[in-house]
Swiss-Prot record:
InterPro entries: Longin-like_dom_sf (IPR011012), Sedlin (IPR006722)
Protein name stated in the entry: Trafficking protein particle complex subunit 20
Miscellaneous remark of the record: Present with 1200 molecules/cell in log phase SD medium.
Location relative to the cell: Golgi apparatus, cis-Golgi network; Endoplasmic reticulum; Preautophagosomal structure
Length: 175
């Protein structure tokens, strides 16, 4: 099952892009779909930004504090019960059998992935593995931000970053 992953900046600029393939499908997405992937991903950003500002219904019901319980706007809507997981938005969109998942940082960086399928069946996403993948890639991104020679708007071209993201994909996405 191929996946196309991107980190999108605050101004909807791509900061990092990569396609993951597996042994079953080493070519990844078909060529015509490879060209459409950035457009599909950017089309889903509107949904991600809408979800970003929705009030978290669990914090409103449970009175867990935060913006949701006092009637103000919430920062991140999530299916998560605790506040540590509320950056992971889960499946936010679909496009002709492709699922799109998202994670958004508190600084407004969007981590978005298109999940392809190897057959004409619907894509099944393991939320726990996806959440772990996004959280670990976010940690790598934060470490990249700590580099004094990196500007937040520049694309990430580090081979070390790329290698670590590929390792995380093998660890979390190939299950």
């Amino acid at each position: 099952m191929p996946q196309y992953f991107a980190i999108i900046g605050k101004k909807d600029n791509p900061v990092y892009e990569i396609e993951f393939t597996n042994a079953e499908n080493p070519q990844g997405f078909p060529q015509d779909l490879k060209e459409l992937n950035p457009f599909i991903l950017h089309a889903s950003l509107d949904i991600v930004e809408d979800l970003q500002w929705q009030i978290n219904p669990t914090s409103q019901l449970n009175g867990n504090g935060g913006n949701g319980s006092n009637g103000g706007g919430g920062f991140l809507r999530s299916r998560a019960v605790n506040n540590t997981d509320n950056c992971y938005l889960g499946k936010v969109d679909h496009f002709y059998g492709l699922a799109i998942t998202a994670y958004i940082s508190y600084s407004g960086m969007k981590f978005v992935m298109i999940h392809g399928n190897s057959a004409n069946s619907s894509v099944v996403i393991d939320d726990n593995n996806m959440r772990s993948f996004y959280q670990e890639v976010h940690e790598l991104y934060v470490k990249t931000l700590m580099n004094p020679f990196y500007k937040i708007t520049d694309p990430i071209r580090s081979p070390a970053f790329d290698s670590r993201v590929r390792t995380l994909a093998r660890k979390h996405l190939s299950k």
